[in-house]
């Protein structure tokens, strides 16, 4: 789901609830952990939208600001704001160099937004990005399939990140989960 290292973000829509989880590790290069408690999942648009990023922190903050502006411009219409962000991100010569990916969600939609112009809504209500993304996605799918009836979206998101943190050296166990 992406070649960006040093983070894992997982999001799920399950049984009418939405949750997004991210780890707290910031890695400098390939060898040094600079921070253990970064917050990579944010609430936007009066708390009605969750956004998580993988990639360069400075680039992600630029994209968060731009995306929040698009949400304001389109009165909280998440799909429209995501498409407009992707169009601008892809067409602008400076923005095109930003190295990050976003997962954004509200109570109705879950979307992956990238700088190459993709806006993807998953079929199964789950997305993951970052170096531990594949591990978290596999764990989330298994948890939903085999324990989904007894677990909430928040519980699945947290457990998926815990499993990814056990496997991926760029993902730590300081997990922040936000839910809608």
Curated annotation (Swiss-Prot):
GO CC entries: HslUV protease complex; proteasome core complex
Superkingdom assignment: Bacteria
Reaction equations catalysed: ATP-dependent cleavage of peptide bonds with broad specificity
One annotated GO molecular function: threonine-type endopeptidase activity
Annotated residues for binding of Na(+): 165, 168, 171
Principal subcellular localization: cytoplasm
UniProt KW keywords: Allosteric enzyme, Cytoplasm, Hydrolase, Metal-binding, Protease, Sodium, Threonine protease
Subcellular location: Cytoplasm
Pfam name, any one: Proteasome
Enzyme Commission (EC) number: 3.4.25.2
Alphabetical GO biological process terms: proteolysis involved in protein catabolic process
Coiled coil, from the record: none
Thylakoid in keyword set: no
InterPro entries cross-referenced by the UniProt entry: ATP-dep_Prtase_HsIV_su (IPR022281), Ntn_hydrolases_N (IPR029055), Proteasome_sua/b (IPR001353), Proteasome_suB-type (IPR023333)
Active site: 7
Top EC class for this record: hydrolase
Quaternary state and interactors: A double ring-shaped homohexamer of HslV is capped on each side by a ring-shaped HslU homohexamer. The assembly of the HslU/HslV complex is dependent on binding of ATP.
Family in the record: Belongs to the peptidase T1B family. HslV subfamily.
Protein task: Protease subunit of a proteasome-like degradation complex believed to be a general protein degrading machinery.
Annotated protein name in UniProt: ATP-dependent protease subunit HslV
Organism whose genome encodes this protein: Geobacillus kaustophilus (strain HTA426)
Taxonomic placement: Bacteria, Bacillati, Bacillota, Bacilli, Bacillales
